[in-house]
A protein has these predicted regions:
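Acidic, surface-exposed loops and disordered segments
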Residues: 1-245
Length: 245
């Protein structure tokens, strides 16, 4: 369990340094055969899980695939794309099913001698009410009907109140961790490629992924080959995506 001070100072990284790191990251399709050291992988994963996430429930998990035989089996599962020939692949999984254990973990691992009453109350009462959907999603259905009435009086959170909303909830936090992970590898000099092109059914069988886990991407990692980037970068004008209010 990693502990961090509550008053962590703002990072000394400059805007220019951050811009340089982000602009240097590209989706690389071809890698050399050079292995990624375990200490680099661990450091990057430690930075990945520092990503902001909903209620600190950290609904993610990662499978680090280094075994050459397993990587060879993954290649056709990933539509035989070149990026899937990387010397390291990390399966990034969203976990809508781990919130209950996470609530208990926060109480068990609280970094102070006494767990504040408000923390106990939130993780023993509020969070279970918020995230529990009940058998067949029936409790979620009850909450949706209850909120329709209660929300007439004041603003209320209206999600997640279904299994589908729980999946969205977990994916949002996990995507933040995945971005941390890619930038962390970039800072170590290793390129990445997030892959969505895979056969999920075969992927689950190959990696024995838990039934309720959601494979949101496979992250190829390695040293960039000479022709690793296929095309120049293209982004639409910012004005197409931003509204100032």
């Amino acid at each position: 369990m990693s502990l961090f001070p509550a008053d962590t100072a703002i990072s000394p990284a400059t805007p220019a340094a951050l811009r340089e790191l982000i602009e240097s990251r590209r989706a690389v399709r071809r890698f050399t055969a050079e292995a990624v050291p375990d200490d680099v992988v661990r450091d990057c994963l430690e930075l990945a899980v520092l990503a902001p996430n909903s209620c600190n429930l950290q609904p993610w998990s990662f499978q680090v695939i280094r075994d050459p035989a397993l990587l060879a089996r993954l290649h056709p599962v990933c539509m035989s794309q070149n990026a899937a020939k990387a010397p390291l692949i990390i399966a990034v999984l969203a976990r809508p099913d781990t919130w209950k254990q996470a609530c208990q973990n926060i109480i068990d691992y609280w970094p102070e001698p006494e767990v504040p009453a408000r923390i106990r109350s939130f993780y023993n009462k509020t969070a279970p009410f918020q995230y529990n959907q009940g058998p067949f999603g029936l409790f979620g259905l009850f909450k949706r009907q209850l909120l329709r009435v209660a929300a007439w009086r004041k603003p209320l959170m209206r999600a997640p109140n279904s299994q589908a909303q729980m999946r969205i909830w977990a994916v949002k936090s996990t995507a933040l961790a995945a971005q941390n992970l890619m930038l962390a590898f970039q800072s170590h000099g290793y390129a990445t490629c997030p892959m969505e092109g895979f056969d999920e059914v075969r992927l689950r069988k190959t990696l024995n992924i838990p039934r309720q886990a959601l494979p949101i991407m496979l992250l190829a990692v390695g040293k960039q080959d000479e022709k690793g980037v296929y095309n120049p970068r293209l982004r639409f004008p910012l004005e197409q995506h931003v509204t100032w209010l």
